[in-house]
């Protein structure tokens, strides 16, 4: 019991540091221009394209375990199908990143403008949220989609995927962060947690 309490305390400290680092990353990310964010997104697309074989290898590990879960009734066949990555899904995923690159910067847009008095104008301007938490199941390609949109909109993100796709989730997080590091992007923008306890905290 004492050992379990120590482990829980250590995990709590690790999670606390992760969230603190994500908040700091969000502040840096909020001030980046569109060109810098697009360069990061392009680096992600290229790194995923370059490492497709590794992604499929990790995905196959998840699929092998998921087959047993389908047999035992712990997950459905439709969940298994969503978990599976193929060339078409990969191509669409990468194309989706380039589609986001083409979008205008959603940050610092004037949404409303009201003249209150002479030389006094009130503006409603779009800004990043900060740190976003997203929970998803089965579809590991969601990591790439959410990470892409988070970066474009100037937000850091904490992701919790389903345990059935843990190997695929981990490789996507690794490749995304590798790409971000290669262009000197702020660290700790994309973060992955693994348990419901982490999310509850």
How would you describe each model-predicted region?
Residues 2-6:
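Extreme N-terminal basic, low-complexity initiation segments
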Residues 7-121:
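N-terminal Rossmann-like NAD(P)+-binding subdomain of aldehyde/semialdehyde dehydrogenases
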Residues 102, 110-201:
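Rossmann-like NAD(P) dinucleotide-binding subdomain of oxidoreductase/dehydrogenase enzymes
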């Amino acid at each position: 019991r004492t050992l379990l309490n120590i482990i829980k305390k250590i995990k709590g400290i690790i999670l606390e540091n992760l969230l603190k680092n994500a908040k700091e990353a969000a502040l840096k990310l909020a001030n980046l221009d569109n060109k810098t964010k697009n360069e990061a997104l392009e680096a992600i697309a290229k790194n995923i394209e370059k490492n497709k074989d590794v992604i499929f290898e990790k995905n196959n590990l998840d699929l092998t375990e998921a087959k047993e879960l389908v047999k035992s009734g712990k997950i459905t066949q439709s969940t298994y199908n969503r978990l599976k990555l193929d060339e078409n899904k990969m191509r669409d995923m990468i194309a989706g990143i380039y589609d986001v690159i083409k979008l205008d910067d959603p940050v610092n847009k004037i949404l409303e403008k009201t003249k209150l008095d002479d030389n006094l104008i009130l503006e409603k301007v779009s800004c990043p949220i900060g740190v976003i938490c997203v929970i998803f199941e089965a579809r590991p390609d969601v990591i790439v989609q959410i990470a892409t949109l988070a970066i474009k909109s100037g937000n850091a993100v904490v992701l919790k995927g389903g345990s059935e796709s843990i190997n695929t989730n981990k490789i996507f997080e690794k490749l995304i962060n590798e790409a971000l590091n290669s262009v000197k992007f702020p660290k700790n923008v994309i973060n992955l947690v693994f348990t419901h306890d982490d999310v509850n905290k």
